[in-house]
Amino acid sequence: MAKPTPAPRATPFLLAAVLSIVVVAASGAEARWYGGGGGGGYSPSPSPVSSIVSEQLYASLFLHKDDAACPARGFYTYASFVRAATRFPRFAATGCADARKREVAAFLAQISHETTGGWATAPDGPYAWGLCYKEEINPQSSYCDATDKQWPCYPGKSYHGRGPIQISWNFNYGPAGQALGFDGLRNPEIVANCSDIAFQTALWFWMTPRDTKPSCHQVMVGEYRPGPADVAANRTAGFGLVTNIVNGGLECNRAGDARVNNRIGFYRRYCQVLGVDVGPNLDCEHQQPF
């Protein structure tokens, strides 16, 4: 792998136990950009994603995202999600009905894991706590790859994980900003401050092939065509390959990784809710990272 894969380091998943303490204590026993607000009652124009996930369903999938204990409470609105999706017209709109639903389930599962506040015995189960965080907690560094001259780091800026997919590193913030219309190198903080931009960065990552990697979208809708190197690395199409694209350097080619299993747990739940089978190759245990 030429460069690290964008992913949080001190992930919300690893910090869920801390949140569980907070939850128990509280209960007693992220011109063209839209701002982050927007409460209930949003009526989007018909769109591929809104035809699959209604506002009511969205609220039920992310049951605890606005709990007082979640740092991202009030941030990840349905309106922002749908508005962001309109910038990517092929998202949730490619292939048959099952393929479209499966892609949405996979996307929501990946962002749920990246932002989860759940734990094994959490109220309503561990898979009801997606979108609880909008920013990496206690980042270990500024995630600046100084060798990347195309996307040079700006002094004093940190490129740690932010937003639903926890985009990280200067070589991701830079091109994401260029594609979406903001300065990702000088103003990476906007990903944690504007919910529309936060969702757009996640969808940009989802839809965009990078270097030797296919896009997550291509994998989930059947457009991925493995080359000889992919075949040799056992990078077979399925949800597991999406995990490889997102964070394979840390999670793939190893047995029983808890993070991989957590992603699969979210994915199974969302596929069940949407009434679609999960498809093959859910994990990346035997895949070489990109």
Curated annotation (Swiss-Prot):
The active site is at residue 114. Keywords: Carbohydrate metabolism, Disulfide bond, Glycoprotein, Glycosidase, Hydrolase, Polysaccharide degradation, Signal. The keyword Glycoprotein applies. Its EC number is 3.2.1.14. Transmembrane segments: none annotated. Expressed at low levels in roots, leaves and meristems. It is an enzyme of class 3 (hydrolase). GO terms for biological process: cell wall macromolecule catabolic process; chitin catabolic process; polysaccharide catabolic process. Gene3D superfamilies: 1.10.530.10, Endochitinase, domain 2. GO terms for molecular function: chitinase activity; endochitinase activity. Disulfide bonds join 70-132, 144-153, 252-284. It catalyses: Random endo-hydrolysis of N-acetyl-beta-D-glucosaminide (1->4)-beta-linkages in chitin and chitodextrins. Glycans are attached at residues 193, 234. Residues 1-28 form the signal peptide. Belongs to the glycosyl hydrolase 19 family. Chitinase class I subfamily. This is Chitinase 10. It comes from Oryza sativa subsp. japonica (Rice).
